[in-house]
UniProtKB/Swiss-Prot annotation:
Family the entry assigns: Belongs to the HSP33 family.
Keyword Signal (UniProt): no
Annotated protein name in UniProt: 33 kDa chaperonin
Database matches in Pfam families: HSP33
Membrane-crossing segments per the record: none
Localization of this protein: Cytoplasm
Disulphide-bonded residues: C236-C238, C269-C272
Described purpose of this protein according to its UniProt entry: Redox regulated molecular chaperone. Protects both thermally unfolding and oxidatively damaged proteins from irreversible aggregation. Plays an important role in the bacterial defense system toward oxidative stress.
Domain of life: Bacteria
Molecular functions (GO terms): protein folding chaperone; unfolded protein binding
Keywords: Chaperone, Cytoplasm, Disulfide bond, Redox-active center, Zinc
Post-translational modification: Under oxidizing conditions two disulfide bonds are formed involving the reactive cysteines. Under reducing conditions zinc is bound to the reactive cysteines and the protein is inactive.
Amino acid sequence: MDKIIKSISKNGHFRAFALDSTLTVKEAQERHQTWPTSTVALGRTLIAGQILGANEKGDTKITVKVLGDGAMGPIIAVADSRGHVKGYVKNRKLDYKKASTGEVLVAPFVGNGFLVVVKDMGLKQPYSGQVDLITGEIGEDLAWYFLSSEQTPSSVGVNVLLNEDSDTVKIAGGFMLQALPDATDEEITEIEHNIKSMPSIATMLTSEEPLKTMLDNIYGDMEYKNLGEFPLEFKCDCSKERFLEGIKSLGREPIEEMIAEDHGAEIICQFCENKYEYSEDELKALLK
C-alpha cells in the first residue's frame, strides 16, 4: 500500500512529508493508458495533490491544475485529506524526451502557464491561488506556490520512474520540506545543503526503507520526530447515481434528444475511465 510519513524536527523549526505513491501512479497509468511522458506528468501532479491534501484536515478537497500552453494540455488532480487522489491529463499520448540522467523531462511538453490550487473547505467560496509555472517540472512549481501563495519557504521533489522495457511505472513518490517561522537562517542553509546533496528521489525510493531514507537525507544531523504513517491511494468518488443527477441537471430537451437519437446514454468518467450506461427507461424516469 502507498503511504506518507509526516514528520517534524525536534526543535519544531521544520516539517517534512515523504511519500511512496507507486501504486497510485500505476493505477492512473493503467486506467488512462498514458504514454511515458504523459504518465510522468500526470504522476507528478497526483503526488503534488497528495502532498497538498496531507496539509489539510477534515473534508477539505484540493484541486491542482497544471495549465500550460504546451502539447500536454491541462493536467488535473483532485485530492482530499484522507490520502485519496484522482486525476487526468488531456494529452495521454506523449512519448520520451529524456534528460542526460535518464529521467523523463515533462517541462518541454507542459510549456508556459500557471499552477492553480483550489481549496474547497465546504464554505460558500473555495479559496483559489495561482502562480506562474517556473519550470513546468511540477515539484519546483509547487514549492513556488507554497512560497508565493502561502508565504512558506518550501522544497518539493516529486518523480515517477518508468520500467525501460515496458514504459510501466516502476516507482513513484516524493517529499515536501517546509521551514516553520522559528527556523534560523543557519538552519535553513543546513537543510538546503542536505537537499542539494541528497540522492535522487528514484534512488531513495528503491532503498530498503525508502521513506525513512528520504527523511534522514532531508534532516541530516538534525533530529526529527515521526508523526505517523498514513495510507495513500488512487480513488475516484464517481458513481452511476451521481452522473444521473448530472444528466438530470441538463434539462428536458437534451434528455429527450438522448432518448430519441441514442435510446439511452453512456458516460465515461474523465478522472478514472469508469463507464456508466443508462437505459431509455432510466432517462425517461428523469422526465417524470
